[in-house]
Amino acid sequence: MQLKATSPLAEWLSYLEKSHFKPIDLGLDRIKSVAEKLDLLHPAPYVITVGGTNGKGTTCRLLETILLNHGLRVGVYSSPHLLHYNERVRIQNQDLPDEAHTASFAFIDENKTESLTYFEFSTLSALHLFKQAKLDVVILEVGLGGRLDATNIVDSHLAVITSIDIDHTDFLGDTREAIAFEKAGIFRENCPVVIGEPNVPQTMLDQAEKLHCQVSRRDVDWSFEQNAENWQWQNKKVRLENLPFCQIPFANAATALAAVQCLPFDISEHTLRKSLQEVELVGRFQAIKADRREKIADYLGVPVETLPIIIVDVGHNPHAAKYLSEKLTALKYSIEGKMIAVCGMLKDKDANGVFAHLTPIIDGWHCVTLGGYRGQSGDELADKLKSHFPHVQATSDNSVMDGVRTALKSAVKNDVVLVFGSFHTVAEFWSVVE
């Protein structure tokens, strides 16, 4: 059946998932031909592309918040979504209604010349929606790698690299040097590049030099430091002192501030401070607040006052696990209880690398099953954990909420329950608390 602009979004998404013979098929030829035909390669007067292993989402969010507070019209394309596809395209900090997406999908479908992957289709649709909205700035979050990612059909004015670590090795290579080369594919000749990774592989620096990019590197051109009450950011011209703590990692906030220095907009220090206080993104070391704690208590049939501290995080690789370990270690100084993990991970992720950072701080593990062709069972994950770290206490459950229920039953008020390991893990939990 031919889908129409008025067909339900769920039907369109099902169609997108099946529209190409491979779910991931890196390359720019298919998508670029459609984008050129529809004149989608220039979605706004200024475009920022953000790549990196971790930290892309929070860096994009702070850049978006700053630019909106400066009074600009801003669009953001990000992935993956947590609960609803609509989260992937934001215009003026608003998700678009289903009808906007289905109309855009129909337009792309009518004009495509060959089959497209889900991500290629959604990228073209986002660019079409941005162009219709007449924006000042578009922020594109890279989906996978950079050089061959669908977002790379657009020549951005500023490239941002948040971090570099080993992930997606089937597509990007199994060394930091190979991965850095792929991520450097978003660089453009004579355009500025901001790098938030402190240990930059030479392959990335070589690519920047080859293209005559103006590079702004962490700990070389700019730096940040934090203390118990606030933090500071500085480069060779600007020093921002007594900055407010924010709800995203300092390294990502600092990278966004470095990117702001490269923009052609005169953004005030007041706007930066206001934005740091406002910025937040679901699933990034996020403590569950009172209203959602009540929903969890109702769901489990327990008094809300008996619930422990509950934190969710989408971290799913060793680099993210290291950050989690640091945050949990700091938290442990202020509580008296145990650290309990509810962990669900996709089978193509480096689970042992994640466990290595977290087993010293986690007192008990509940490994849970994730569905889908990339999912793995809680039993498989628990076996991996116990085979490499035989001293740990680990059980398995058939779903995220089964694991959460088991963990919360064993926890007391001063404990911490961490739900993490994948966007899918957090999404399954979040669907209940929302």
At which residue positions do the language-model features occur?
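Internal gly/pro-rich beta-alpha loop/helix module
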Residues: 171-186, 191-258
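Charged, amphipathic alpha-helical linker segments immediately N-terminal to NTP-binding catalytic cores
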Residues: 1-22
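Hydrophobic positions on the alpha1 helix immediately C-terminal to the Walker A/P-loop
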Residues: 58-62
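C-terminal helical cap/extension that packs against the catalytic core
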Residues: 194, 198-203, 210-212, 225-228, ...
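Nucleotide phosphate-binding/pyrophosphate-handling subdomain across enzymes
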Residues: 132, 137-140, 150-160, 164-168, ...
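ATP-dependent carboxylate-amine ligase catalytic core
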Residues: 8, 23-24, 28, 35-45, ...
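Hydrophobic anchor at the beta1->P-loop junction of P-loop NTPases
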Residues: 48-50
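Extended acidic/charged loop-beta regions that coordinate divalent cations
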Residues: 125-171, 205-239
